[in-house]
C-alpha cells in the first residue's frame, strides 16, 4: 500500500508520537500576545501547502497568536511565504532585524543545514531579547537519517527523499551539514544559555509510503539506541 499514513487510522489525524505535535505544543505554551516571533529558515512555508489535519494546522500556524510573526531565509522563496505577517531575506549571513527585536526564534528542520554555526549563533543571539527562547527541531547527528544523508551525495539527496518520502516536494530538500546536532554540540555552542533540550523519537518518517515498511521501521525504532532514531528538540533560554 503506497502513500500509507499511520495518522489516517487515528482519531484527530495524528499519532501518539507525532513530532510536529510535540514540538509546536511546547512552542504554543511559550507564546504571549505581545511577542514577536521569528521563523528562521521559514522558506516558502511548505507546511501550508501540505495535506495535514486541521488540528495540526492550527497548532503549526503562529500567525495571529502573537504581535508579529516574521519569516526569514536565504532563499528568495521566503518572500512569498503566506504563513507570516512579514518576510525578510538574509543577506551575507545577516538578519535585517534590530538587536533584541524578537522574543522567540523558531528553527524547524533548519539547523542540520547550517554550515557556519558560529555566525548563525551570533545572529540568533543578536536579534533575540534577553530571556527569549530559541526553539529548534533537528535530526541527531547519529540518527540513521543523518547517517544516510552523509552517505548519499547532496546531488542525489532530492531523488532519495522523493523515494522514501513520496509526499515531499523536491523544492523542500536542501544540502545537509550536521554541525550542531548532538547534545554536547548544542551545549558547547550555546554555553551559558539555560537548556531544556531533549532527545525525542517520533514515528518513522522514511518508509516509502508503505505500511509494511512503516511497521518494520517502527520495530527498528524500538530496538536501536535513541540517538540513532531520535531528533533533538532544542529549547534554550537566553540569559
Model-derived segments and spans:
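S-adenosyl-L-methionine-dependent methyltransferase catalytic module, highlighting the catalytic core
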Residues: 2-6, 115-123, 127-129, 133-239
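Class I SAM-dependent methyltransferase Rossmann-like catalytic core
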Residues: 1-30
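Conserved SAM-binding loop
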Residues: 30-146, 233-238
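Amphipathic alpha-helical segments that form well-ordered structural scaffolds
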Residues: 26, 61, 185-189
